């Protein structure tokens, strides 16, 4: 039997909280450093304006990140809904209005969870793939009582630590990384699922996996 602490949603929230607090500490540390710099300039009779402006910018970033993370951590679970997995994936792909998305395979299964949150999770993965400007393929698969959608596009993940793309402050040119992927992982975990990123040759594969709903 799985203990409460080992459940996907608990593990995902714990991981998010660790990363969130680390990312929040980074701009706050910068605020402290620049305020100290402003004080030293002031004591020398110099203009502290530049240091104060940088401190203000970092403080605004920290506050924005804090509000987003707080909202996410305090969000209450909503009504559980059961729906067809394949239809859900197809609607999400068509909803983007992208012509270069190909869907292969089928599962014939159902999943259950907060549909609006799962919509957001799948959308975050799709948007990242579509923004790569390459042809995107989606492969549906059923394995060991789990339903999976693999979203593939040409591209490269960071070779040092792909997991940092799930960090709330992570970002990239034209990418919806960061809080979008962090939210996707949390929302999938709330439904007993997982979100993974992997590199296969010259292609990035984002996988959203959910337990099949029986009956």
What residue spans do the PLM features occupy?
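Residue-level recognition of the "H+4" position in the DHp/HisKA helix
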Residues: 19, 26, 30, 171-172
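Conserved C-terminal segment of the DHp
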Residues: 30-45
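Conserved catalytic submotifs in the C-terminal HATPase_c
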Residues: 102-110
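Conserved glycine-rich
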Residues: 134, 192-193
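Short beta-strand/loop element within the Bergerat-fold HATPase_c
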Residues: 135-146
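Short conserved segment of the HATPase_c
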Residues: 157-169
């Amino acid at each position: 039997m799985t203990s409460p602490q080992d459940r996907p949603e608990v593990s995902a929230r714990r991981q998010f909280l660790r990363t969130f607090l680390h990312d929040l500490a980074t701009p706050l540390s910068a605020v402290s450093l620049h305020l100290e710099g402003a004080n030293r300039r002031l004591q020398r009779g110099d203009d502290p304006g530049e240091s104060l402006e940088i401190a203000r910018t970092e403080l605004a970033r920290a506050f924005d990140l804090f509000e987003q993370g707080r909202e996410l951590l305090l969000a209450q679970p909503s009504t559980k809904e059961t729906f067809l997995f394949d239809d859900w994936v197809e609607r999400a792909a068509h909803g983007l209005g992208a012509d270069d998305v190909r869907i292969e395979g089928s599962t014939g299964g159902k999943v259950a969870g907060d549909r609006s949150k799962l919509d957001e999770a799948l959308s975050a993965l799709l948007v990242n793939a579509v923004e790569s400007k390459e042809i995107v393929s989606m492969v549906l698969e059923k394995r060991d009582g789990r339903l999976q959608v693999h979203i593939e596009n040409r591209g490269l993940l960071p070779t040092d630590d792909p997991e940092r793309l799930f960090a709330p402050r992570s970002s990239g040119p034209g990418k919806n990384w960061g809080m979008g992927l962090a939210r996707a992982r949390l929302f999938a975990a709330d439904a007993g699922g997982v979100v993974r990123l992997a590199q296969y040759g010259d292609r990035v594969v984002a996988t959203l996996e959910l337990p099949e709903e029986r009956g």
